[in-house]
């Protein structure tokens, strides 16, 4: 009679890896009967799927073939070029060239507006005023630019009104052609530019261009008048900025002297003088004086 070692544990026979078994001490025989009744069948692998890259390549090839087919049919049809004809027997202009000229004009338009208006003087004076106050980025650049633009429209209102009444409105009503309208508008802008340009700057650019002297100021071409006007605007803006800077500079010097006398050399004079400069600017109504002086510098001439 064979003795069974109590320490020896009977291990279950290897079963299918896909089946789970109960604990060996409780269901060894149950597991064996289940294995005999339903033998393990190997799992069938699923159908191989087409790679995603292959499908994307197929879609791209189909789109490319469709595009080539459409391009070939359009070329075979021979579509005519789009053109605009002015009047009977007029000149035919390609629409693409007109669009190119219009886009070029729109690109240059902001520079022309800034260079032929009061914007340059106004924005420089406001920037110098902010630096004199020592407020760093207060008011911010967006506020200064908006104020300069609104003040520019206010100053240019008489000139813009004359442009509309004498040039744009008759052209839109069909009373005059495009060329006379451009000539009238150019004459109005010349009057504004000449009225705000120093003679010395005008003579300097005329000599540099090798032209002149001119019998009438209206005979000066825009190629000479525009740089002379910009130079005059810069000079006038710096003169106004110098006058605005002086009182705040005096306050800074007084505060610095007082701090040095008290032995507070580590304390920044700009930090101490800022409240006094703001108080002075508010008491004298500085914004109204600055904006009014800028407007009067154009209208007073």
From Swiss-Prot:
It is a multi-pass membrane protein. It is found in: Cell membrane; Bacterial flagellum basal body. One of its GO terms (biological process) is protein secretion. InterPro entries: FliP, T3SS_IM_P. The keyword Transmembrane helix applies. It comes from the Bacteria. Pfam families: FliP. Keywords: Bacterial flagellum, Bacterial flagellum biogenesis, Bacterial flagellum protein export, Cell membrane, Membrane, Protein transport, Transmembrane, Transmembrane helix, Transport. The chain crosses the membrane at residues 64-84, 99-119, 143-163, 240-260, 264-284. GO terms for cellular component: bacterial-type flagellum basal body; plasma membrane. Residues 1-24 are annotated as: Disordered. Belongs to the FliP/MopC/SpaP family. PANTHER family: FLAGELLAR BIOSYNTHETIC PROTEIN FLIP (PTHR30587:SF0). Plays a role in the flagellum-specific transport system. This is Flagellar biosynthetic protein FliP. It comes from Cereibacter sphaeroides. The gene is fliP.
């Amino acid at each position: 009679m064979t003795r069974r070692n109590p320490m020896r544990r009977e291990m279950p026979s290897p079963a299918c890896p896909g089946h789970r078994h109960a604990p060996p001490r409780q269901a060894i025989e149950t597991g064996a009967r289940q294995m005999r009744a339903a033998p393990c069948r190997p799992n069938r692998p699923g159908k191989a799927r087409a790679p995603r890259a292959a499908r994307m390549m197929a879609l791209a090839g189909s789109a490319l073939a469709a595009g080539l087919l459409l391009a070939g049919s359009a070329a075979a049809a021979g579509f005519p070029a789009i053109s605009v004809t002015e009047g009977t027997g007029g000149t035919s202009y390609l629409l693409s060239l007109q669009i190119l000229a219009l886009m070029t004009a729109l690109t240059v338009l902001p520079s022309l507006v800034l260079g032929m208006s009061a914007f340059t003087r106004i924005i420089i004076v406001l920037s110098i005023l902010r630096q004199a106050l020592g407020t760093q980025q207060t008011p911010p650049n967006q506020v200064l630019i908006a104020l300069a633009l609104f003040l520019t429209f206010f100053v240019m209102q008489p000139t813009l009104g004359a442009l509309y009444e004498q040039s744009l409105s008759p052209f839109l009503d069909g009373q005059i052609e495009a060329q006379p309208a451009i000539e009238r508008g150019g004459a109005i802008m010349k009057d504004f530019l000449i009225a705000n340009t120093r003679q010395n700057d005008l003579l300097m650019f005329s000599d540099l261009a090798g032209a002149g002297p001119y019998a009438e100021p209206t005979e000066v071409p825009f190629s000479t008048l525009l740089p002379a006007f910009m130079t005059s605007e810069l000079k006038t803006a710096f003169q106004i900025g110098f006058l605005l800077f002086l009182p705040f500079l005096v306050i800074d010097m007084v505060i610095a002297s007082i701090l040095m006398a008290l032995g507070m050399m580590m304390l920044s004079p700009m930090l101490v003088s800022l409240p006094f400069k703001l108080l002075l600017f508010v008491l004298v109504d500085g914004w109204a004086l600055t904006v009014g002086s800028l407007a009067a510098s154009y209208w007073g001439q």
